[in-house]
């Protein structure tokens, strides 16, 4: 089997090289043999490690689990090194994998998370070249000052602080010069290698990753699209006074250069920053939940990269209010109406612990017989908690350990699910995990108020949809009254929770208890 793996890897290398050179798909100057060879060699070594390390060990034994964890860790480290060496698209895909907590083995997610802080930086000369090519001017002609050290560097671009000739302070997002040319070739190479691995491990189902990259990378590499997304979401969520989205300066923006209003603050997972600046951690967590519930359930237009570097918080010194600043609008998921309704109804069923409807809507979303696993993936809760009601108790440390260990145990079933569910679901799962990571860092995870906000948005979305499909005035009035009653019940329950947690509520409960005992 190991010999077959090496033969297939060699065959893939030869076939890829012949095809790429023969079809002039690859320019050796920017995508040389070293780059391709590095990816092929890493894939071959990882494959060989899995084949040989677990070959003669009884499946399910303690030794098997220990060795498998070690192979996961070695493989994740090799994959991280490959991403750092090949940069660009490889880092982007590695970051995506690192965000899939509770879906991939912890050895992978923990190891690949560091890619968010290990993105490459373009040189001053490369930055000047991109600005010259896209804007037709030198940096000194456009800016009074331009900071050489970037505010942040990501897999596809980096951001610099600058001051325009008219005195406006701006953030300048500049694409790494070679990313555009290399991205399609990188994706093609990944596709070839994953197909080879699937021949060796038939249960290996990660083609969804390549398909998502094919669809999303061209959008992320078009900064004009990012600017349009920023303006759309700012208009869509204008009723949330706590949200700030940087203004776009279109006159100096292109597909590779984006100029926007400069905004600064602490990262949303930096609890120490919030405590130092008098920002209520629970309020930030609640407001972030409101934003994403509105985007997902009501509007179906979802910012899909809420890692901490893209979500900042700041307290206004004049008003004392805390703001959430939403950055990096390159990756959005547009949800179809039918998908959004099924997703709303599924979450309502999960919150109510209505298992028949959980099964029904999970199946409609492609989960099939794996609907219990799907429910656990969505909620990051155990099946026992899902059955009991996910709003009934917070996540315990033991439950969290159980979920993470199950991610490794059920990896074949998880990858099967990820291949079967609609493509829209994949980015939502990533978004859910990133948001859970923020809640975990702030110690505000899965509070009752977050489920109440989700319920409100789901009820509003379903009611709006039902009214739009009804031609009967009586039916529309009935839908509106049912909606109002449901929202009133949620408000009443929220008031009960507030009283229960307040001093007044504690006093009332103690008073009633004394009255009861006295009688």
Curated annotation (Swiss-Prot):
Disulfide bonds: none annotated. GO terms for cellular component: mitochondrial inner membrane. InterPro entries: ABC1_dom, ADCK1_dom, Kinase-like_dom_sf, Mito_struct-func_regulator, Prot_kinase_dom. GO terms for biological process: lipid homeostasis; mitochondrion organization. SUPFAM superfamilies: Protein kinase-like (PK-like). Keywords: ATP-binding, Kinase, Mitochondrion, Nucleotide-binding, Serine/threonine-protein kinase, Transferase, Transit peptide. Its main location: mitochondrion. Residues 145-481 form the Protein kinase domain. One of its GO terms (molecular function) is ATP binding. Its EC number is 2.7.-.-. The active site is at 305 (proton acceptor). It is found in: Mitochondrion. Gene3D superfamilies: Transferase(Phosphotransferase) domain 1. ATP binds at residues 151-159, 173. It comes from the Eukaryota. Appears to be essential for maintaining mitochondrial cristae formation and mitochondrial function by acting via YME1L1 in a kinase-independent manner to regulate essential mitochondrial structural proteins OPA1 and IMMT. The action of this enzyme is not yet clear. It is not known if it has protein kinase activity and what type of substrate it would phosphorylate (Ser, Thr or Tyr). Belongs to the protein kinase superfamily. ADCK protein kinase family. PANTHER family: AARF DOMAIN-CONTAINING PROTEIN KINASE 1, ABC1 FAMILY PROTEIN. This is AarF domain-containing protein kinase 1. It comes from Gallus gallus (Chicken). The gene is ADCK1.
């Amino acid at each position: 089997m190991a010999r077959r793996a090496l033969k297939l890897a060699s065959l893939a290398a030869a076939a890829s090289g012949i095809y790429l050179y023969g079809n002039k798909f690859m320019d050796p100057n920017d995508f040389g043999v070293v780059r391709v060879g590095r990816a092929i060699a890493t894939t071959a070594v990882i494959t060989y490690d899995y084949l040989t390390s677990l070959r003669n060990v009884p499946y399910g034994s303690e030794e098997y689990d220990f060795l498998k964890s070690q192979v996961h860790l070695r493989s994740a480290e090799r994959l991280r090194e490959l991403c750092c060496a090949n940069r660009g698209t490889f880092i982007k895909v590695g970051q995506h994998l690192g965000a899939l907590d509770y879906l991939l083995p912890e050895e992978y997610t923990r190891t690949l998370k560091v890619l968010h802080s290990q993105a490459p930086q373009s040189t001053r000369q490369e930055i000047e070249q991109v600005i010259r090519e896209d804007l037709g001017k030198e940096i000194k002609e456009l800016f009074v000052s331009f900071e050489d050290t970037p505010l942040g560097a990501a897999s596809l671009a980096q951001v610099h602080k600058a001051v325009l000739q008219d005195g406006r302070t701006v953030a300048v997002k500049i694409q790494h010069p070679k990313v555009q040319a290399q991205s399609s070739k990188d994706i093609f190479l990944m596709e070839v290698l994953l197909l080879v691995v699937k021949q060796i491990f038939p249960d290996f189902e990660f083609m969804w990753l390549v398909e998502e990259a094919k669809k999303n990378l061209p959008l992320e590499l078009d900064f004009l699209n990012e600017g349009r997304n920023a303006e759309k979401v700012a208009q869509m969520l204008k009723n949330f006074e706590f949200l700030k989205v940087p203004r776009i300066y279109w006159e100096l923006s292109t597909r590779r250069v984006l100029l926007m209003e400069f905004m600064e603050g602490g990262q949303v997972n930096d609890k120490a920053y919030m405590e130092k600046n008098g920002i209520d951690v629970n309020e930030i967590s609640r407001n972030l939940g409101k934003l994403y519930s509105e985007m997902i359930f009501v509007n179906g237009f979802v910012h899909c990269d809420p890692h901490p570097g893209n979500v900042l918080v700041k307290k206004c010194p004049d008003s004392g209010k805390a703001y959430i600043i939403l950055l990096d609008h390159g990756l959005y998921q547009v949800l179809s109406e039918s998908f959004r309704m099924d997703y709303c109804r599924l979450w309502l069923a999960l919150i109510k612990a209505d298992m028949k409807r959980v099964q029904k809507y999970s199946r409609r979303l492609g989960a099939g017989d794996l609907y219990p696993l799907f429910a656990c993936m969505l909620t990051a809760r155990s099946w026992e908690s899902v059955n009991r009601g996910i709003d009934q108790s917070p996540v315990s440390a033991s439950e969290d350990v159980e979920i993470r260990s199950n991610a490794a145990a059920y990896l074949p079933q998880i990858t099967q699910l990820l291949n079967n569910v609609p493509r829209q679901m994949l980015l939502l799962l990533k978004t859910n995990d990133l948001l859970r990571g923020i809640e975990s860092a702030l110690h505000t995870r899965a509070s009752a108020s977050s489920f109440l906000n989700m319920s409100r948005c789901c009820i509003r979305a379903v009611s709006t949809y039902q009214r739009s499909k009804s031609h009967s005035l009586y039916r529309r009035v009935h839908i509106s009254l049912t909606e109002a009653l449901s929202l009133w019940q949620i408000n009443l329950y929220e008031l009960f929770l507030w009283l229960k947690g307040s001093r007044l509520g504690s006093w009332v409960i103690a008073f009633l208890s004394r009255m009861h005992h006295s009688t």
